[in-house]
C-alpha cells in the first residue's frame, strides 16, 4: 500500500505536509468530494496530528472550487468551531501534455455524532463507538429539553460569536452542521456557504447558479429565502439559532412540509411560539 503525500505552497513555507494511505476507504462522501482520514506531519519536529482531507471531485464548476477555497480560508481556533487547516492545489501533467488540477480541503478530524443524529437517538460515532457526552445530552433531550437546549445553544453561540467577530456569517446553521465530539465539545461545522460580510456581492445571494436556495429552508431567515444580500448579516445566523432553540425544546422545527411551503411560511407566518410553553 502506497502513501499519498500532499503539500501545497503554503505547506512548504510552513514546513508541513499531509499524508494518507492510498488504499484507505473514505470516511464520508458529499456533493463536492470524498473525505479521508489523514495525518498532518511537521517536517521540522516530526509532530503529527490526525486530519480530515476532502478530495474534491474532478470537473466541478469554478464557483464550487471557489466556495471550497473560501471555506478553507476561515481558519479560526475556537472550541466550538471546526478548525480549517488548508486548501491544497496540485497540478498534474497528463500524458497529453495538459495540466489537470486537483483540489483538497483539510480540516481537523472530528469524531462523534451530529446533533441531528443525536436528536434521532443515535449516540455512537461512525465506527460504532459510544460518545459519552452525546449519551448525556440525549438523556437531557429526553428528560429536560430546556437544559439540553441551553447547553447546545450556548456552546454554538460561543463559536458563532467568534465567527462573527472575524467578520463572517455562517448562513447554514442546522443540526446536521453541529457535531458532538468524542472529546466533549459541541462544534459548528461546514463553512461551505459562509461569507465575509464586507465582501457580500450580488453573486452571494445564497443561491446556486440555477437560482436554487442553498441552505436548509427550515432554518432560513427571510433575507436568505429572498436572496436579499443587503440584509444578510449576523442576525441571519441569529434567526437560525432561534429556530434551533425552538427545535431543541419542542422536538421539531416550527415549519414543516414540502420545501416550497416551508420557504413561503418563513416569509409570511409568525413563529408558533406558544408551542415552547406547552
Language-model regions, residue ranges each:
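Short beta-strand micro-motifs within the conserved protein kinase catalytic domain, predominantly
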Residues: 83-101
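Protein kinase catalytic-loop region centered on the HRD/HxD motif
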Residues: 158-168
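Conserved short submotifs of the Hanks-type protein kinase catalytic core
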Residues: 97-114, 118
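Protein kinase glycine-rich loop
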Residues: 23-30, 35
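Activation segment signature within eukaryotic-like protein kinase domains
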Residues: 152-153
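Conserved activation segment of eukaryotic-like protein kinases, specifically the C-terminal portion
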Residues: 207-224
Amino acid at each position: 500500500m502506497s502513501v499519498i503525500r500532499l503539500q501545497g505552497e503554503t505547506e512548504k513555507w510552513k514546513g508541513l505536509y499531509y499524508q494518507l494511505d492510498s488504499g484507505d476507504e473514505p470516511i464520508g462522501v458529499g456533493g463536492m468530494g470524498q473525505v479521508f482520514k489523514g495525518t498532518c506531519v511537521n517536517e521540522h519536529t516530526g509532530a503529527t496530528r490526525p486530519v480530515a482531507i476532502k478530495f474534491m471531485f474532478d470537473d466541478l464548476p469554478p464557483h464550487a472550487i471557489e466556495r471550497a477555497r473560501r471555506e478553507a480560508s476561515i481558519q479560526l481556533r475556537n472550541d466550538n468551531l471546526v478548525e480549517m487547516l488548508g486548501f491544497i492545489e496540485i497540478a498534474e501533467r497528463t500524458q497529453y501534455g495538459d495540466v489537470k488540477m486537483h483540489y483538497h480541503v483539510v480540516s481537523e478530524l472530528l469524531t462523534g455524532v451530529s446533533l441531528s443524529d443525536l436528536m434521532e437517538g443515535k449516540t455512537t460515532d461512525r465506527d460504532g463507538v459510544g460518545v459519552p457526552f452525546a449519551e448525556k445530552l440525549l438523556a437531557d433531550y429526553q428528560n429536560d429539553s430546556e437544559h439540553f437546549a441551553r447547553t447546545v445553544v450556548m456552546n454554538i453561540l460561543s463559536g458563532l460569536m467568534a465567527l462573527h467577530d472575524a467578520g463572517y456569517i455562517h448562513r447554514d446553521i442546522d443540526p446536521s452542521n453541529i457535531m458532538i465530539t468524542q472529546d466533549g465539545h459541541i462544534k459548528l461545522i461546514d463553512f461551505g456557504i459562509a461569507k465575509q460580510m464586507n465582501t457580500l456581492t450580488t453573486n452571494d445571494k445564497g443561491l446556486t447558479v440555477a437560482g436554487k436556495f442553498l441552505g436548509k429552508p427550515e432554518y432560513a431567515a427571510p433575507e436568505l429565502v429572498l436572496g436579499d444580500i443587503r440584509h444578510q448579516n449576523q442576525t441571519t445566523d441569529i434567526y437560525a439559532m432561534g429556530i434551533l432553540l425552538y427545535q431543541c425544546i419542542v422536538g421539531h422545527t416550527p415549519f414543516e412540509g414540502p420545501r416550497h411551503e416551508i420557504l413561503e411560511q418563513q416569509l409570511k407566518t409568525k413563529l408558533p411560539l406558544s408551542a415552547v410553553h406547552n
